[in-house]
Amino acid sequence: MFIAPFVPSPQTVVEYMLKLADLKAGEVLFDMGSGDGRTLIMAAKTFGARGVGIELREDLAKKAMGNIHENGLDDRVTIMNDDMFNVNLTSADVVYLYLTTSANEKIKPNLERDLKKGTRVVSHDYEIIGWRPDKVENFCENPQIGYPSHTIYLYKKP
């Protein structure tokens, strides 16, 4: 089910979000709606994590797989061309979201069902209604001009 357009997170925002989520080497990051794979590539290259990307659009899934291959990360990052509602998230240590508030609302039951205690969920600009964030931080992508500004929500599964 299509629930959000492809709008890539800027690299500086991705790095900030992964640091906020305290992503560690060897952990597994799930990117729900992984687009071109940029978040997964940074997670693997910069943080030493493993990644699983879920992308409904076949063209974007193929692009992500190509980008992952070009970066030599085929052994650490996987792309699933599938609907995020069909995916088991039990192996996730961190879940990355850049959806919409309504899309977060729709994926919330899957997160509540599958995530183990302590799993971190980091969301770009859109909160998860009914969940209490551990942190809410504003990140200015270009401080010299004062915008664009991004709100980052960090949640931990109790």
Predicted feature locations:
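C-terminal substrate-binding/active-site "lid" region of AdoMet-derived donor-dependent transferases
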Residues: 102-158
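Conserved class I S-adenosyl-L-methionine
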Residues: 26-35
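A short SAM/SAH-binding and catalytic strip from SAM-dependent methyltransferases
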Residues: 90-106
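Conserved SAM-binding loop of SAM-dependent methyltransferases across substrates and taxa
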Residues: 38-47
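Conserved SAM-binding motif I beta-strand of class I
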Residues: 50-55
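S-adenosyl-L-methionine
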Residues: 1-27, 61-91
